[in-house]
Amino acid sequence: FDTYIDYYNIDLDRNIWIKGMLRTPMALKLFCDIYKNSKVGSLSKNSVVITKLFQKKINSIEIVYRKAGKETDSQGMVMTTLVMVANMLTDKMELSYDEIYSACKEPIKSHLEDILKFVEEEGFIYSRQSQKDVFSIPETKYSWGMQPAFDYLMARKLFDAIKENKTIEAKYTNGIYQMLSLIAIEEDKKLISEYSNISLSDETTFDLICYALANTSVEIASVYRDYVKELMNYSSEEFREIFDRIIMPTSNVPDHPLGSILLDEFLRGFEKPAQRDIWWSIPTYLIDSNDSYWRCYTEIDTSNIKLSNDDNYLGLPLILVWRLSSVDNDVRKECRLKLTEWGINNSEQFFNLCTYCADINDEQIIEDVFSVAYGIALGQNVQDKYLISLSDWIMDNVFSDEGLVRYENVVVRYYCTGIVKMAIYKRVYDIDVENKIIPPYTYQASIMPACEEAFDAGRMSGYDPIDYDLARYVLCDQFDCFFRPDHKTNSYSEKTEKLIDEYRR
């Protein structure tokens, strides 16, 4: 992105959000073609949607062609030619000049050769010389240069037909349908499912809705926030599909209504971590889960997330924090490493992330977040401001009277103690607080209510009290079965040997 912006000499003028919206090479190229050698001022966020970029690009080359004195203001020969060629190429790989010429009307016929050369220079079409044999006259063949541009033009034609209440029965490529769904939501404020005169399968409709919501402008996406939340609540599988197709692609756009903030709001809605884990933390295809409502086929994959110094803490970093609840320790390790690396270079942003997530009702997440915070504090070049701000927060929220009850977690206290001690060691924090961060702590500890029936219970009575060595209870008994002779296998082997002997006779 930065290389393209520099090469085309574009001044974004603090419009950092543009980087997140231009998610494909084609969108970036169109943007650079339109705004090259200029300063981007106040820009509407829907102006960088791919369909708007194509529309603006085609309008701009029409103006260039018009300024050359090739057509009048009332004519749109470039656009007309592009739509015509796109329509003809739906059934063919390439076209001859004569085929295009025979489909034209005046005044395009008189300017066709010039128009085709012009749009080829702009990259919309591609030409090659073809010969049947070495003695025949070369013939020019035309094919499409930019596939997304072809999809856009066909979608534009389909949209006009839909608005005229024509029934769309022919089948088109996924790229055309994607462009159509995006044009519909941008210009008609409708999802593709709201049109009765186009027939699509439920699966295709869902895919197109996700594509449109992930790629439309922020203003329009905000209208569908409640709708997306409703889809997320439908099932764990639907939720994971929404995360993969909508939330992940939009989370690098600052304050996107369908991005990581929506995910955070949804996951915080679970009363207990175990309820949330079924939707978010467990892997797919669990054994004996065919009849379970949490059965999933879509794996939550955040391995491709790469954090940069431009990332806001409420964007992709927030997703990585939530992934710390995974039951896969390799996933947790990867997320901790990414957050640590990012936090070292963006300590103020990480401080905001840490304090924002400190009230999540998941001990595993809280422990991992503070382990990252401690790791950053131990860095050789850690900023004093980070140590001071985080130490202040820890003293007010972890080692306060309320905090000792809320964070009654030895792991969290260990990391927090280490952070404050590091601030004291660096001589940026008051040493007098040291007696408050070292046990014993004075507070009313929370005690789990005892089950009275369990006091009189015997072994194997249903309450399973720990009546002998804890290590053996937790470890040995649980693994004992792995070291027993496999009676079923041995029995199977004996029967097999008898069967083989019988048939040998």
Each language-model region and where it sits:
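Generic helix N-cap/helix-start motif at coil->alpha-helix transitions
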Residues: S96, P148, I168-Q178, L200-D207, ...
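C-terminal leucine-rich, beta-strand-based interaction scaffolds used for sensing/assembly
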Residues: E94-E241, R245-H256, R268-P273, T284-I287
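Extended amphipathic alpha-helical scaffold segments
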Residues: N304-Q364, D368-S371
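Extended hydrophobic
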Residues: F1-K163
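Amphipathic alpha-helical scaffolding segments
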Residues: N46-K52, Y101-E106, F150-D151, L158-I162, ...
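Alpha-helical repeat solenoid scaffolds
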Residues: L28, M79-V83, Q147, R240, ...
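Long internal repeat-built scaffold domains in very large eukaryotic proteins
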Residues: D202-N312, I376-R505
